[in-house]
């Protein structure tokens, strides 16, 4: 929020799991948990079950390394099914860097999931900005995820598309963001 010079920010990290944080329109961090990893984004009875919570349709299954690994066979990519999720992500990102269309489908699918989920999150959060980050968004795949999410918002939720800006941290935000936030913390004691 500080480096963006705006508030009403929902930050979503797509990595080993899914993490999130929210800064309200007044620049405050609210006193509730923003545990979107276990909030449902797929309400279909056949949605993917989360191995930890046992719930179906949880965000973590759609916005993390697990999502990439789950989509690998559906995209027709042959990887060892016993390969750890981080390694599968790296392999898919390598394929994407080489222009592989099957890898592209994985990131497009995650982007579609994200577009619909942002619209769903907007039912609960006053959002002007969505900041997407994490290992899954590294490289060209992250750009594709944002493009597809934006396409979904424009096509299905045009009013939200006009009011919500999607972004990833630029290099300065990555390098200086934590230091700026830490320097702004009040002293305790």
Describe every region a protein language model picked out:
Residues 15-18, 40, 136:
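Glycine-rich beta-alpha junction loops
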Residues 5-6, 15-16, 126:
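Short, well-ordered loop/turn elements at secondary-structure boundaries
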Residues 2, 10, 45-189:
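ATP-binding/phosphotransfer module of carbohydrate and carboxylate kinases, centering on a glycine-rich
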Residues 1-5, 38-41:
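Active-site glycine-rich loop that binds ribose-phosphate moieties when present
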Residues 11-13, 18-24:
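Short beta-strand scaffold segments in enzyme catalytic cores
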Residues 8-10, 29:
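Structural motif
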Residues 21-40:
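Eukaryotic endomembrane system proteins
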């Amino acid at each position: 929020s500080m480096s963006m010079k705006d508030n009403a920010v929902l930050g979503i990290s797509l990595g080993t799991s899914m993490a999130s944080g929210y800064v309200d329109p007044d620049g405050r961090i609210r006193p509730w948990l923003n545990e979107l990893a276990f909030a449902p984004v797929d309400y279909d009875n056949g949605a993917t079950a989360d191995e930890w919570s046992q719930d179906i349709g949880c965000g973590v299954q759609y916005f993390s390394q697990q999502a990439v690994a789950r989509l690998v066979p559906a995209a027709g990519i042959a990887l060892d099914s016993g390969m750890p999720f981080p390694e599968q992500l790296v392999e898919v990102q390598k394929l994407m860097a080489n222009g592989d269309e099957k890898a592209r489908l994985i990131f497009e699918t995650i982007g579609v999931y994200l577009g619909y989920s942002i619209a769903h999150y907007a039912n609960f959060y006053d959002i002007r900005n969505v900041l997407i980050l994490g290992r899954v968004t590294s490289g060209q795949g992250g750009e594709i995820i944002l493009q597809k999410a934006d396409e979904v918002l424009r096509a299905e939720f045009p009013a939200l598309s006009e009011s919500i800006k999607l972004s990833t941290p630029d290099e300065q935000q990555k390098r200086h963001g934590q230091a700026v936030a830490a320097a702004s913390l009040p002293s305790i004691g």
